[in-house]
Swiss-Prot record:
UniProt record, GO biological process: tryptophanyl-tRNA aminoacylation
Name of this chain's protein: Tryptophan--tRNA ligase
Motif window: 'HIGH' region: 11-19
GO CC annotation: cytoplasm
Top-level EC class as recorded in UniProt: ligase
Catalysed reactions, semicolon-separated: tRNA(Trp) + L-tryptophan + ATP = L-tryptophyl-tRNA(Trp) + AMP + diphosphate + H(+)
The protein's Enzyme Commission number: 6.1.1.2
Role played: Catalyzes the attachment of tryptophan to tRNA(Trp).
InterPro entries membership: aa-tRNA-synth_Ic, Rossmann-like_a/b/a_fold, Trp-tRNA-ligase, Trp-tRNA-ligase_bac-type, Trp-tRNA_synthetase
Keywords: Aminoacyl-tRNA synthetase, ATP-binding, Cytoplasm, Ligase, Nucleotide-binding, Protein biosynthesis
């Protein structure tokens, strides 16, 4: 029996190179080997200030990118989180067994809310509980995530264990965390110490998956390096050039040592030019297919409804099982 894999991407802003290398590309490989559930995290998206008019388009665009990148809806279950109401139902049940202190330790809330924690919405604070519900509702065996989500996954495991201990039986599967070594944490093109992010105010901090070829060339050309004239790899002392080398390696499959050796006497200009080209070679087909799919909204909606229908079968089984243990009438 195939193991179950679950993962998703928030439908906020344009998806970028970090989303592709850190998540989506890995999913393409997994769809042949696992029973995969890949969702559009639109409920998570509204924990920040997002316009109603933008959310609908963002959902469709993320779905189009999933498909354009190579996810096959006949092999995997693709759905919008908001179309499977059981996620919210299980989230409430998990809220009722999760100690408040556990949530207060979540660093991502502190990072996103900043100094205005008192003004932040409850949804942002309880975000990790909904994330736990997203995972546990499908009894996922494996959850591929970036390093920045590891704390949330550890919380998910803890919550599953609380439920199982409370009712003295394994109701919820305690998932394994899968963190890929290459491509998981692509950093900003403007600051090698910050993760590439959709929320960064500078568009030149990231390569968006729908960027034109010319814009990709511009962004890589202007990507920050440092004052040294040679290429070397050290994430602590040379984070920016190390990030560019990581991106090159992710596409070329060559070792960092070989890449450095190839460009040792050619300087940054040639390296950046070739890096832009290798990115374009890989992203252009995805961009073109995405634009084509965005013109067929009827097809995209069909995929969402089909995926949600399939997901709800699995999700409702888990929710009813948990509700029964709590004592609710099913």
């Amino acid at each position: 029996m195939k193991k179950t894999v679950l993962s998703g991407v928030q439908t906020t802003g344009a998806l970028h190179l970090g989303n592709y290398l850190g998540s989506i590309r890995n999913w393409i490989k997994m769809q042949e080997e696992y029973n995969c559930f890949f969702f559009l995290a639109d409920l998570h998206a509204i924990t920040i200030d997002i316009k109603t008019s933008e959310l609908n388009d963002a959902i469709m665009e993320v779905l189009a990118i999933y498909l354009a990148a190579g996810l096959n809806p006949d092999k995997v279950t693709i759905f919008a989180q908001s179309m499977v109401k059981e996620h919210v139902e299980l989230s409430w049940l998990l809220n009722c067994v999760t100690p408040l202190g556990w949530l207060k330790r979540m660093t991502q809330f502190k990072d996103k809310a900043g100094s205005a924690q008192c003004k932040a919405c409850l949804g942002l604070f309880a975000y990790p509980i909904l994330m736990a519900a997203d995972i546990l509702i499908y009894k996922a065996d494996i959850v591929p995530v970036g390093e920045d989500q590891k704390q949330h996954l550890e919380l998910t495991r803890d919550i599953a264990e609380v439920i199982n201990r409370r009712f003295d039986k394994e109701i919820l599967k305690v998932p394994d965390i899968l963190i890929s070594e290459t491509g998981t944490r692509i950093m900003s093109l403007r600051n090698g110490l910050k993760k590439m992010s959709k929320s960064d105010i500078s568009d030149f901090s990231r390569i968006n998956l729908k960027d034109s070829n010319d814009l990709i060339h511009q962004k890589i050309k202007k990507a920050k390096t440092d004052h040294l004239s040679f290429i070397s790899y050290n994430k602590k002392t040379r984070p920016e050039i190390s990030n560019l080398l990581d991106i090159y390696k992710s596409f070329s499959k060559e070792s960092i040592e070989k890449i450095i050796d190839n460009y040792q006497n050619q300087g940054f200009a040639k390296f950046k030019e070739d890096l832009a080209e290798i990115i374009i070679t890989n992203l252009q087909p995805i961009r073109n297919k995405c634009l084509e799919l965005m013109n067929d909204k009827e097809y995209l909606l069909k995929i969402l409804h089909k995926g949600a229908q399939k997901a709800r079968i699995r999700a409702s089984e888990t929710v009813n099982e948990v509700k029964k243990q709590f004592g609710f009438i099913i």
